[in-house]
Amino acid sequence: MERWTGRVALVTGASVGIGAAVARALVQHGMKVVGCARSVDKIEKLAAECQSAGYPGTLIPYKCDLSNEEEILSMFSAIKTLHQGVDVCINNAGLARPEPLLSGKTEGWRTMIDVNVMAVSICTREAYQSMKERNIDDGHIININSMNGHSVVPQSVVHFYSATKYAVTALTEGLRQELREAKTHIRATCISPGLVETGFAFKLHDNDPERAAATYESIRCLKAEDMANAVIYVLSAPPHVQIGDIQMRPTEQIS
């Protein structure tokens, strides 16, 4: 990780869960991390904790609604002005709405598309352009995906969500191919976890907290820190090694 010391990483959805754990890990390794979310209160608290702990890097909170392209473009413009640009882009932000294919609300589907697919695509484009204009040839774009992007589970409330995650799988491989065509050594990686103990299930089942709690009680889940360790592993790979996809489940998880 030495080559990343002092360089700039963008982590979307950095206020809680996987995003917060990844942001903390990168700061621990000396990176300058821009952590964005719709609300930055928790990121500001995390930044203070990192500073108090004496971590060599810094965490810069940035308020951004990833469903709004103008806000994304404004964020990248600010990063360029204040920090020159992005060297690592970690597209972590994602959400699910309990909207089945046969009866779901269009608004919920559109929200998932906007955040899980469009925001990932826009951030990827802008991160690449930031790297290109500064002749950065060793940058990295990491998409935090899901095992739902590799298999469809028999739960109607996550079928549309699964479709958006299949899109992330395709986008990551398409990105890898386009980067090769562009004759650059910028790398693209997809990290696909199974069940991670975060607040994700409580947001999905916001009207049924008992069901959400049962999701995490059924097996010993992955932790957000496991995902952060996977990100560090990917970034630590030698420049000639392209890690395309990491699929990781809790040992006890079946599907």
Curated annotation (Swiss-Prot):
It comes from the Eukaryota. Pfam families: adh_short (PF00106). Substrate binds at S146, Y161. One of its GO terms (cellular component) is extracellular region. The keyword NADP applies. Keywords: Lipid metabolism, NADP, Nucleotide-binding, Oxidoreductase, Secreted, Signal, Steroid metabolism. It is found in: Secreted. One of its GO terms (biological process) is estrogen biosynthetic process. Residues 1-23 form the signal peptide. Its EC number is 1.1.1.270, 1.1.1.62. The active site is at Y161 (proton acceptor). NADP(+) binds at residues 13-18, 38-39, 44, 65-66, 92, 161, 165, 196-199, 203. Inhibited by flavonoids including apigenin, luteolin, genistein, kaempferol and quercetin and also by carbenoxolone, zearalenone, glycyrrhetinic, curcumin and flufenamic acid. It catalyses: a 3beta-hydroxysteroid + NADP(+) = a 3-oxosteroid + NADPH + H(+); 17beta-estradiol + NAD(+) = estrone + NADH + H(+); 17beta-estradiol + NADP(+) = estrone + NADPH + H(+). Pathway: Steroid biosynthesis; estrogen biosynthesis. GO terms for molecular function: 17-beta-hydroxysteroid dehydrogenase (NADP+) activity; 3-beta-hydroxysteroid 3-dehydrogenase (NADP+) activity; estradiol 17-beta-dehydrogenase [NAD(P)+] activity; nucleotide binding. Catalyzes the conversion of the 17-keto group of estrone, 4- and 5-androstenes and 5-alpha-androstanes into their 17-beta-hydroxyl metabolites and the conversion of the 3-keto group of 3-, 3,17- and 3,20- diketosteroids into their 3-hydroxyl metabolites. Exhibits reductive 3-beta-hydroxysteroid dehydrogenase activity toward 5-beta-androstanes, 5-beta-pregnanes, 4-pregnenes and bile acids. May also reduce endogenous and exogenous alpha-dicarbonyl compounds and xenobiotic alicyclic ketones. Belongs to the short-chain dehydrogenases/reductases (SDR) family. This is Dehydrogenase/reductase SDR family member 11. It comes from Gallus gallus (Chicken).
